[in-house]
Amino acid sequence: MKLSYLWRGLPGHPLHPPLTDATIGIYTFATLAGLVEVVGLTNRNGAIGWWLGLVFGLVATVPTALAGLADWLTITWGSELWWTATWHLLAMVSATVFFGLAAIFGHTAYTHANVSAGAYALTVIGFGLMTLGGWLGGAIVYVHGMRVLSLVDEPTERAVAPVPHPEKEMAEGS
């Protein structure tokens, strides 16, 4: 077992993608909770869910970003994959900045069980940037094929096994 498996995941089972699912889900919840408060569908619960969602999203961003950075550092500098991954990184960091600003500038309104228009606008901008970053992340995997092993004839029990096999390590180049 290699130490790098702790921050990069196993061959064929990278760590960054499942972490992004959780992080994107949390920020999506925060954006929707803020929306229901802004349009008046809730009287205070939307504001509480919005702000707590932003905070939990920011916490979840840390391991997600670190796992992504670990993958980014393995890419050949200046390659087309590197450019796509770098734009993905910039979009996601920008989204995080906007979500962070929304949490900071929206805290006072949150303490009064409200969502301010400015803080919610920052949330929506963050959500838009996150969506762009997700699109670019999809290109990294589905167009460039990063960390895709393409072992199409791998038996199911070996494909899903949480133990790295030599074929997987060789296919990933590790």
Spans of model-derived segments:
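Polytopic transmembrane helical bundles with strong interfacial aromatic enrichment
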Residues: M1-L73, W77-S174
